[in-house]
Amino acid sequence: MATAILAQFPLGPEREPAWGLHLRPSNMRLFQRASFAISAATMEGLPTTSVAEIAFAGRSNAGKSSAINTLANHNRLAFVSKTPGRTQLLNYFDLGDQRYLVDLPGYGYAKVPAAVRAPWERLLGRYMLEREQLKGLALIMDIRHPFTEHDDRLLNWFAPSGKPVHILLTKSDKLSRTEANQVLQRLRKEVSDAGAPFTMQLFSSLKKSGLEEAEQVFAGWLDMPLPAAALVVPARPSFTRKKTVTTPKTAAKKKPVG
């Protein structure tokens, strides 16, 4: 990247290279502009102005809301419920330019009554298969409990859409780096052997790790530009040469020859 940017500043016959030119990663996040837009309980209540949207799904307590908040660099954008399974709506967050992030209801919490769970499942099924603006699914999985029965069920619902799935293995900070990478490689192999076209990565909301990798994927889905790195040109240091004061040597007096 640095080489490409430097190429935009060719040296001329009377031009010196910029002093100490380097890139400083931007503190801006891809979803930095996200703001709550609307909650919908039916397909008819979804925004009609949407051009592209990405949906976040995950088992209750897998860290979905925390992942959204981390990606948006916002502590309270997505509500982190103390009672898992209580979010029953599709929550839309406006990213600007008619792009949206959609927080889907959490699933797989045993204490949710079947009468409450059934409408969620119908809504999720319709949304994932019928929503043309949906460009891809971000599936949140706790790295310690990946591919639960409920995760598999959701993936089977989504598969007929033919749209991409990117899996965030959250809470990777709960394992050592070696252990987390071993889990990642094992799961990637299992997915590859099964012929499933999923991509996946490690992610930690606590350590804020994995953000750049996730943003690369989601920016491509939404056709959004990534935040540009800041081009930093520090001031040229000033060097002042110290003047050396020389004292004229006094000629030695000749001794009289006597």
Name each region found by the language model.
Residues F31-A41, L175-L231:
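Canonical P-loop GTPase G-domain recognition
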Residues F9-G12, E16-Y109, P248, V257:
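Conserved G1/Walker A P-loop phosphate-binding module
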Residues T3-L6, E53, Q201-G258:
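C-terminal end of P-loop GTPase domains and the immediately downstream helical coupling element
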Residues M1-W19, F158, D193:
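Intrinsically disordered, low-complexity proline-rich regions
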Residues S50, R76, L89, V116-W120, ...:
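Helical mechanochemical/support elements of P-loop NTPase systems and associated helical scaffolds
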Residues A41, R86, R99, G106-Y109, ...:
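Conserved nucleotide-binding/hydrolysis micro-motifs of P-loop NTPases
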Residues G125-F198:
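Conserved C-terminal guanine-recognition region of P-loop GTPase G domains, centered on the G4
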Residues L46, P84-N91, P105-K135, I143-W157:
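Switch II of P-loop NTPase G domains
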